[in-house]
Amino acid sequence: MTSLTQRSSGLVQRRTEASRNAADKERAAGGGGGNGEDEAQSRRDEQDDDDKGDSKETRLTLMEEVLLLGLKDREGYTSFWNDCISSGLRGCMLIELALRGRLQLEACGMRRKSLLTRKVICKSDAPTGDVLLDEALKHVKETQPPETVQNWIELLSGETWNPLKLHYQLRNVRERLAKNLVEKGVLTTEKQNFLLFDMTTHPLTNNNIKQRLIKKVQEAVLDKWVNDPHRMDKRLLALIYLAHASDVLENAFAPLLDEQYDLATKRVRQLLDLDPEVECLKANTNEVLWAVVAAFTK
C-alpha cells in the first residue's frame, strides 16, 4: 500500500458558555471519554464552518476534498497514472465515519494490540445522509467477524483474491463523488471523445472553493503550522495524510515558491515520520484516524 501523509490545521475553536457547562457536567458524570470528546469536537467543527459562512451545499467530505485536489481543473478527471487515489478514498471514508461517531476500534486489551491488528467496530448505524458513507457503514456493521482497518481499505477497493468478498467493493466511487461535487456547484459534467470512446468528465466550475481548499492545506503546514498534530483540527490533519496517500498533495503545493515548497514538504515529512502507535495513546485522539495513517505508512 502506498505511503501516506499528514493533515494539520490551526482551527480556532469557539466554545459558548453552554458548551463549557455541558462539558463540565460530562466530566463530572465520569462518562464520555475519548468518544464523547470526538463527538463534541465534531459539533464544534460544524459550528466553526457555520461561523466561516460556509453553506451546507459547499461543505465537503474528506473524500470530496481529496478528489477535488486530484482533479485536473479543465480536463475534469484525475491522472491516468495515479494508482493510489482509489485506496486513499477508502481510507477517507473510514476516517469520515469515525469523525462522525459511526466507527471505532475495538479495545486494545491488556496485551496492547497494535492499531493494525485491532478490528473496526460499528459504534452507531445512524444514517449519515451520504450514500457512499452509509454503504460502507452497512458493510462494517454486517460483517462478522469484524475486519481491521487495512483489510477494510482493501475490501472496499476490491483488492482481494477472495471471490466471496468481492461484494464489499464500492464501485464507481470517483464518478459518484464527482456527481456530488456537481450537485454542490463545484464541478460540471461534460463528454469528451478519446479516440475510440467517449468519457464523462467533470471540469471545475467553481474555482473559489478549490482555491480555498488549497489555501487551507498550504496554511496548515506554513503560516498556521503548530508543530503538534494534536493541536491541529482532526479533519485537516486527516486531509493532509490522505491527500499524500492518494498522491494528490503535490497539487496543493505546486503554486508555492521554492522556499515555501521546501518548508511545506519538510513539515509533511515530520508528520509522516510520527509513530501512529505512540500518537494514538495521547489525549483527545481518534484511533481510527491513526490506524488509517498506520495502514498507509507501514
UniProtKB/Swiss-Prot annotation:
UniProt-listed GO biological process terms: asymmetric Golgi ribbon formation; cell adhesion molecule production; cell migration; cellular response to rapamycin; gene expression; glycoprotein biosynthetic process; Golgi organization; Golgi ribbon formation
Origin: domain of life: Eukaryota
Compositionally skewed regions (Polar residues) per UniProt: 1-11
InterPro entries noted in UniProt: GPP34-like (IPR008628), GPP34-like_sf (IPR038261)
Record's comment on post-translational modification: Phosphorylated.
Entry's transmembrane regions: none
Keywords: Cell membrane, Disulfide bond, Endosome, Golgi apparatus, Lipid-binding, Membrane, Mitochondrion, Phosphoprotein, Protein transport, Transport
Pfam families: GPP34
Main location group: Golgi
Molecular function GO terms recorded: cargo adaptor activity; enzyme binding; phosphatidylinositol-4-phosphate binding
Region of interest: Beta-hairpin required for oligomerization: 190-201
Disordered: region residues: 1-57
Subcellular location per the Swiss-Prot or TrEMBL entry: Golgi apparatus, Golgi stack membrane; Golgi apparatus, trans-Golgi network membrane; Mitochondrion intermembrane space; Cell membrane
Basic and acidic residues bias: start-end ranges: 14-28
Keyword Secreted: no
Residues that coordinate or bind a 1,2-diacyl-sn-glycero-3-phospho-(1D-myo-inositol 4-phosphate): W81, R90, R171, R174
GO cellular component labels: cytosol; endosome; Golgi apparatus; Golgi cisterna; Golgi cisterna membrane; Golgi membrane; mitochondrial intermembrane space; mitochondrion
Alphabetized Gene3D superfamilies for the sequence: yeast vps74-n-term truncation variant domain like
Membrane-protein topology: Peripheral membrane protein
S-S bonds: C84-C108
Family: Belongs to the GOLPH3/VPS74 family.
Function: Phosphatidylinositol-4-phosphate-binding protein that links Golgi membranes to the cytoskeleton and may participate in the tensile force required for vesicle budding from the Golgi. Thereby, may play a role in Golgi membrane trafficking and could indirectly give its flattened shape to the Golgi apparatus. May also bind to the coatomer to regulate Golgi membrane trafficking. May play a role in anterograde transport from the Golgi to the plasma membrane and regulate secretion.
Subunit annotation: Homodimer. Interacts with the coatomer complex. Interacts with MYO18A; the interaction is direct and may link Golgi membranes to the actin cytoskeleton. Interacts with GCNT1; may control its retention in the Golgi. Interacts with VPS35.
Name of the protein this chain belongs to: Golgi phosphoprotein 3
Annotated source species: Rattus norvegicus (Rat)
Source taxonomy: Eukaryota, Metazoa, Chordata, Craniata, Vertebrata
